[in-house]
Amino acid sequence: MTHELQGPEQDRAALLALIDRLAAAWSGDSPGAPCWLDPEARLDSNLHGQLGGAQDIQNALAADGRQGACTVRTSNRYAAAHGDEGVASFYAYGLLQNRSDAQQALLFGATVVLRATRTEGGWKVSHVRISSSWMRGSERLASHWLLPPSDAGWQVGDPPPVLVSELHSPWALQPIGTPPSDLFDAISELYSRYSFAIDQGDINLLIGSYTADIAGGFAPMGQYEGRHAVIGQLRSFRRHWPWMQHFADLVRVEADPDGRHANAIVGRIVPEQPMTPEGKPLYGAHYQLRARREEDGQWRFCWTDCRPGWFDTDSIPEFDIGHSTA
């Protein structure tokens, strides 16, 4: 007997499916009509500019593969609905390759936020916001982009950023709702919120991802206790890494017998090497995490530690909660 999704779970699944549709369109794998987009949808992108209309948006995304193959993968996904309005966000890492010379390649990363509306034909994306912050490789493949990202960060004369987390994040567009009932989904969404906050420098959003007694190892800075010390150090650290993007997957989670805590392992994706030769997900490091469900019903991290070392889905590390190594 299969479990049918109902209510918020059904909406969340439908919104996550829209992420897959966008990634397929960006990879050039969606040649048909852009039925996942509202006909009057809008795009704001620091790569593609401002566009209106479903077909123009799909064409602009597909054009990134005009000189060869464009492959876009996603991680750090979040989706929620409030009435007939939905929001979603995800990280995208893409690879552009030249058809005639596979050695000419460009790897890039982006943060994407979607707004969607419930229609008689299902959920449709009404707005796409794409903010790319880094790229590596042959810049010739990105000559059609308006503002190819660089590691230099903001410079005098730069246009305003496309994405301002305090205004445009899913949690700014909608109030944080009740976490999913499924523990894996709930902790996965918590990590997506945390990573969005730290990578965008949204300190208020980051504060809400930690308990007041957060502790652990924060490589390369060291071990800290308490939200004051942790947030202060992370804010200062983040200033020097404007292109930071914590691509990651939740790979293991277990509920604590007390019903209020959960242990989790999150694998850090390295976009340059996301798969094994056999096609299995590959990770370059992992986080040992402990989360607590607090009185407001929200999960927050209360302990964390970062561990270097490669592993795949057949060799996921064991739990080692409470032992800080940073």
Locate the predicted segments by residue:
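A solvent-exposed, acidic/Ser-Thr-rich amphipathic alpha-helical stretch
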Residues: 14-18, 30-94, 203-272
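Short N-terminal micro-motifs specific to bacterial/archaeal maturation
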Residues: 6, 24-25, 48, 197, ...
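Conserved catalytic-core segments centered on acid/base and nucleophilic motifs
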Residues: 197, 206, 291
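Short, hydrophobic/aromatic alpha-helical segments in well-folded domains
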Residues: 21, 111-115, 190-194, 233, ...
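A beta-strand edge to alpha-helix "cap/lid" segment located at domain peripheries
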Residues: 2-9, 65-182, 239-243, 254-326
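Active-site-adjacent bridging/hinge elements
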Residues: 168, 200-201
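Short, aromatic-enriched amphipathic alpha-helices that serve as compact interaction elements
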Residues: 10-29, 183-199
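Short, structured motif recognition centered on aromatic/hydrophobic residues
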Residues: 17-19, 23-24, 123, 128-130, ...
